[in-house]
Amino acid sequence: MSDEEQSAIVCDNGSGMVKAGFSGDDALCHVFPSIVGRPKNEQAMMGSASKKLFVGDEAQAKRGVLSLKYPIEHGIVTNWDDMEKIWHHTFYNDVRVNPESHSVLLTEAPMNPKQNREKMTQIMFETFGVPAMYVGIQAVLSLYSSGRTTGIVLDAGDGVTHTVPIYEGYSLPHAIRRMDMAGRDLTEYLMKLLMESGMTFTTSAEKEIVRNVKEQLCYVALDFDEEVTNSAKTVNEEPFELPDGTIMQVGNQRFRCPEALFKPMLIGLDEAPGFHEMTFQSINKCDIDVRRDLYGNIVLSGGTTMFKNLPERLGKEISNLAPSSIKPKVVAPPERKYSVWIGGSILSSLTTFQTMWIKKSEYDEAGPSIVHNKCF
């Protein structure tokens, strides 16, 4: 039996992207959007053998004639039928294996409702017939991938941002902070900013175009007020070519959009802390003796931490909050967009981890609630 035949499958189900591949692999096999698309108009899809449903890249490619839906919102599955379609696509079309022959490691944000992971567990065993499975916390897996056992992870994806302090390999649950604002909220904010300057984006397909604008052109201002002043003095516009060939000029929206990560009130979240405040609050909830080590290992993870200048701005803002003798160190691994998956690949291939899997026999005996006993 080849290694690949018995390797576990690691599937990081993000709100925006699915990352999947074999345990122990260095390189990620498959990345595709967590989208399910259905024809807006049944008659319009004659050529596709009147297919009723498209998943991932195929849905993205046909987005002009489809209505697109993300079954995961803010890290929580809101449509289990569509989620099942995404897992089916992952196993059979992307990784191309029969899940009945492979253990599966899934990921989830901390502080999710208990029934979310119970339902994940149930579907894996009952619908896909996996022999064993495990649910890992995203930020903890990111720390594994950075080669550290102590640090605070700031993980910001498409749906959820969370800070998880970990000391000597143990996460400190009482100090975890979670905010239901992340990349998708920034995309919506950018849509609003662009519409204020006269552009119109309304459909689910056009929202995907705005997401591309965000990922390609937006950056974090090191000093927001200074950037506003400078942009008023000089023309700081970047062209973006729309699918129909029209060129759109994007100006100060480029740095106004990600500013919401530090000032959530910009998008109507008046009580929510910014990235720097979340990190600071999390560290302050930890024992005084471990705080210095956490300040020295602030590890970024997830696609929404990929903005230019974000690590530097975060370091600066945390320095303003921390005791004066502390020099915060923000670690921004270049592969951080995929570090949750990489950590899952590392963890699931360790010999010491093999006793951690939830086996089918244990599930049959205890039911879906077994996931709370065996997975942190």
Swiss-Prot record:
- List the catalytic activities from the record: ATP + H2O = ADP + phosphate + H(+)
Q: Which GO terms describe its molecular function?
A: ATP binding; hydrolase activity
What domain of life does the native source organism fall in? Eukaryota
Keyword check for RNA-binding, yes or no. no
Q: Where in the cell is it found?
A: Cytoplasm, Cytoskeleton
Q: What class of enzyme is it?
A: hydrolase
Which organism is this entry from? Answer: Trypanosoma cruzi
Keyword ATP-binding in the entry? The reply is: yes
Report the sequence similarity comment from the record: Belongs to the actin family.
One cellular component (GO) term of this entry: cytoskeleton
Q: What does this protein do?
A: Actins are highly conserved proteins that are involved in various types of cell motility and are ubiquitously expressed in all eukaryotic cells.
Please name the PROSITE patterns in this protein's record: ACTINS_1, ACTINS_2, ACTINS_ACT_LIKE
- Taking the record's annotation, the residue ranges forming a coiled coil are none
Query: Which PANTHER family does this one have?
Result: ACTIN
Pfam families attached to this UniProt entry: Actin
Annotated EC: 3.6.4.-
* Protein name from the UniProt record: Actin
Keywords in alphabetical order = ATP-binding, Cytoplasm, Cytoskeleton, Hydrolase, Nucleotide-binding
